[in-house]
Regions:
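Bacterial N-terminal signal peptides
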Residues: 1-11
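Compositionally biased alpha-helical segments
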Residues: 13-317, 787-819
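A domain-start/cap signature at the N-terminus of enzymes
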Residues: 274-459, 788, 792-795, 801
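Active-site machinery of serine-nucleophile hydrolases
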Residues: 458-461, 465-571
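Primarily recognizes the serine-hydrolase "nucleophile elbow" in alpha/beta-hydrolase
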Residues: 571, 578-625
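Short beta-strand/loop motif that positions the catalytic acidic residue
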Residues: 624, 630-633
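C-terminal catalytic histidine-bearing segment of alpha/beta-hydrolase fold enzymes
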Residues: 638, 642-746, 750-751, 789
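C-terminal beta-sandwich/jelly-roll accessory domains of carbohydrate-active enzymes
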Residues: 702-820
Length: 820
């Protein structure tokens, strides 16, 4: 009988260890400790002499993961049990002679043949080099690929091998006359959580031995177990899609959720989700029906007309994502003692401000509706004098307090409408332009929205930067996946109730297939099945590099391309500004390392891939304390790890939340197989926009804003422009420090001017606030701080952060010398 016990337990290795980190991640593999990333792991000295290693190393045979030991919550040995299925392939491996020690960008990689061989063509300084490779070890998680013409040990994720290629390789490795060989393939797929392939392997087994009538009965328990695992996997996928806001897809699949031989707990979970959707749909109908019944009871014509507009807006935009706004209205909708005006006021104010802020005074609720309209007009008006007129009208409105304005802004849709999509066949895909620096051309950037995008739901976002020879659009493809025809995708998917889950085949490896499919496909809306779509992320890709650019220049133009694109996207799309992640590949990775450290207040995490930390990064390294880093690189990508170790070692020594992944035997790659772990990592971190204390470094006049402190005029010895690099002897970064203790704010800044931006999320405006800059008190008087509508609106108009608007600003001249 097929043994499932070893298939569903975690994979095990010799001396396997499981490390639980404080952020909830679990690392598995062989445990080691190092004092620095560039050193070779050594066993601890028996007498305890030598430096105590501060860095944890986990080796899982595919990659090595480095984190600070300060991030560890628990270390435990895994229980011994059934190990992974492994297929060992015979190859004529080269053991000496020409040796690969540095791997540049791949020019062409052929598919694996049935014997597990392929030709890998890489670019070198002497031109293209062809290397014949062969898989020697194949497990459910990783494959060892060795050189046949050159000495080379490379590791790749098994998930990156296309299904068809993998199946051919496996079938070539078994004795097709042996029942146990087919079972081994089934166990292999089970351990890789590839349940459809595991089921197919058992079907192939029964077809290969039609004379074995006992096989069907013998395999029945295993087939039932696979059905359970498949249903469990499907339910987990549906929960993921639900959390991503893809309610239409989830609801449709739940209606046809498989029930044959599925356990009660799984069916109950699916049934509860379906019931919840049906309940929310019924609530939506009830809200509109109740409003329709109440509207005729309003005798004032103006009020009735305004209410009808709001009712029509709600009919178009009320959804599962904002249904909670109607809680107060629904609780009182059937109260015979409450007047119609009060009930409608609850509906209107709940719609505008959320149920917790709902009120029962209809004139006030309608006034709030008018204020929201004025806020939107102000935010999209490009002419200053017209904005001032709108602001004057807003101030004349009764109740237009700073608190109300901030509350309305946080519940509004984005202020600017997006343009038309690139093509009707590519929903949610936009090409936009935003002004660059003065005298510079406008910046083009691309945006891909997730399926079923709703402007009332806040979405996490990825800002991604391309490498040399790549485009912004290719970065969108890396994160969101290629375009596919949904009809063709559903035809390939055996279980129509199962939402497609992409494999880890690289986007650039699918381009030719995509082009052929697009030529044959009818003009119907296509879809992306990449992981950004599954997890519900908005992807933003600025075209930041110029034609033929080969390296990152650390310039103001490049920073502006990223920051201006992000702000413009936040004006147009519903982006959760506390969950914006900055990513980049190759020279784009160099850029995000620099930009992430220069502006740590903007990002929930920074993801440099095949990147180099250079120039300003070496001076800004302490800024990494405030933003998590996830660095991915290849063992044979030149000397990158050795160079990056200068900064990474400092991050890890001081316990910063920095993770480094080194793929074994790999070179200058984009490491698409790491994407699932990256999404898991991103899901664990949010930006803290109001830290109680920070100390950051800066050397450029555009690296001037840190959370709630803005600088102007760096000292001469601290300001070094990129065209004057390297800095002259004696140059040092300027420091800015901020600390909030209760209602006391203390700032130290080595600049000529300091501006402090304030919000009730930082200090209590109803209590006395004390502000000290460079040891001098600049504010500690009555009356208390007051919010200013102009400050709030200008802050949101320029920064486009509706979640954290600043309410007021204090400027102070420090008397320090300015730079050039």
């Amino acid at each position: 009988m097929l043994c499932l016990a070893g298939a569903i337990i975690p994979a095990v290795w010799a001396s396997a260890t499981e490390v639980v980190l404080k952020d909830g991640r679990v690392l598995r593999g062989k445990l080691g400790e190092v004092a620095g990333l560039a050193e070779i792991p050594q066993p601890n000295s028996p007498d305890g002499e030598g430096p105590s290693p501060s860095i944890l190393l986990m080796d899982d045979d595919l990659s090595r993961t480095f984190v600070s030991k300060r991030l560890i919550k628990e270390v435990r040995q895994e229980e011994t049990g059934h190990g992974e299925e492994k297929f060992s392939l015979h190859q004529s491996v080269k053991r000496n002679g020409l040796t690969i020690r540095s791997v540049g960008p791949a020019m062409r990689v052929q598919p694996f043949d049935e014997f597990g061989r392929r030709i890998y063509t890489m670019y070198t300084g002497k031109g293209p080099v062809d290397v014949i490779q062969g898989i020697t070890d194949l497990t459910p998680r990783w494959a060892k690929v060795e050189g046949i013409t050159h000495v080379w040990d490379m590791r790749i994720a098994t998930s990156s091998i296309p299904r068809e290629e993998l199946q051919k390789i496996l079938l070539k490795q078994i004795n097709t006359k042996d029942v146990e060989s087919y079972k081994k393939i089934a166990r292999f797929y089970l351990q890789g959580e590839r349940y459809a392939e595991a089921r197919q392997a058992l079907d192939d087994l029964m077809k290969a031995f039609p004379e074995r009538k006992d096989l069907q009965e013998q395999l029945a328990p295993s087939i039932r177990a696979i059905k359970q695992l498949s249903a469990q996997q499907l339910l987990a996928e549906l929960r993921l899609r639900r959390d991503a806001g893809q309610h239409g897809l989830v609801w449709d699949v739940l209606k046809k959720f498989p029930s044959d031989e599925i356990g009660g707990e799984i069916l109950q979970g699916a049934g509860d989700m379906l019931k919840d959707y049906e309940t929310k749909a019924a609530r939506r109908v009830k809200v509109l029906e109740k409003m329709d019944a109440l509207l005729p009871k309003i005798t004032d014509n103006y009020q009735r007309e305004e209410l009808q507009k709001i009712r029509d807006e709600m009919a178009a935009e009320l959804s599962i994502n904002n249904m909670d706004r109607m809680a107060a209205f629904l609780q009182n909708a059937d109260d015979a003692q409450m007047p119609a005006q009060a009930k409608l006021a609850l509906a209107v104010s709940g719609w505008l401000l959320g149920s917790d802020s709902a009120i029962d005074q209809l004139p006030v609720a309608l006034s709030i509706y008018g204020i929201r309209r004025q806020l939107r007009e102000y935010l999209i008006e490009p002419v200053k004098i017209k904005r001032e007129a709108i602001l004057d009208g807003l101030k004349s409105q009764e109740g237009s307090s700073p608190g109300l304005i901030a509350d309305l802004l946080s519940h509004m849709k984005p202020q600017a409408d997006p343009p038309e999509v690139v093509s009707p066949e590519r929903p949610g895909y936009y090409k936009l332009e935003v002004p660059g620096l003065p005298k510079e051309p406008p910046i083009t950037y691309w945006v891909q929205l997730p399926p079923e995008y709703d402007p009332y739901k806040l979405y996490p976002a990825i800002v991604t930067m391309n490498g040399a020879g790549n485009t912004a659009e290719s970065q969108i493809d890396w994160w969101a996946g290629d375009w596919v025809n949904p009809r063709r995708a559903s035809e390939k998917n055996e279980d129509a109730s199962n939402p497609p889950v992409p494999d880890e085949k690289k986007p650039d490896e699918k381009k030719s297939d995509e082009k052929k499919s697009a030529e044959k496909a009818p003009a119907v809306p296509m879809t992306r099945n990449g992981h950004a779509a599954r997890y519900g992320y908005i992807v933003i890709a600025p075209q930041w590099s110029v034609e033929h650019q080969k390296k990152y220049n650390y310039s103001a133009r490049e920073h502006a391309a990223v920051l201006n694109s992000l702000r413009d996207a936040c004006r147009r799309f519903s982006i959760d500004t506390d969950r914006v992640y900055l990513s980049g590949y190759s020279m784009g990775g160099d850029a995000v390392w620099d930009i992430g450290l220069a502006h740590p207040d903007l990002w929930a995490g920074v993801i440099p891939i095949s990147a180099l930390a250079d120039r300003y990064c070496n001076f800004y390294w302490e800024n990494a304390k405030y933003v998590p880093f996830y660095v991915v690189l290849g063992e044979f990508d030149g000397s990158k790890l050795t160079k990056d170790a200068l900064d990474l070692d400092r991050y890890l020594k001081y316990g910063y939340n920095a993770t480094t992944i080194e793929y074994q035997g790999r070179g200058h790659d984009n490491f698409h197989e790491e994407i699932l772990r990256i999404f898991d990592w991103m899901g664990r971190f949010r930006r803290n926009f109001f830290p109680r204390e920070f100390t950051c470094s800066t050397m450029r006049d555009w690296d001037c804003f840190f959370w709630w402190v803005e600088l102007d005029g760096l000292p001469p010895k601290s300001q070094v422009d990129p065209e004057h690099w390297p800095p002259p002897a004696g140059s040092r970064a300027a420091q800015v420090k901020g600390k909030i203790t209760g209602n006391n704010i203390n700032v130290f800044a080595g600049s000529a001017q300091v501006s402090i931006w304030l919000s009730p999320q930082m200090v209590d405006f109803k209590q006395r606030v004390s502000i000290v800059v460079n040891g001098q008190q600049i504010y500690a008087k009555e009356p208390f701080l007051q919010g200013d509508p102009r400050t709030i609106l200008e802050d949101v108009r320029t920064r486009a952060d509706r979640q954290h608007p600043f309410w007021t600003r204090l400027d102070n001249s420090t008397g320090r010398a300015r730079g050039k």
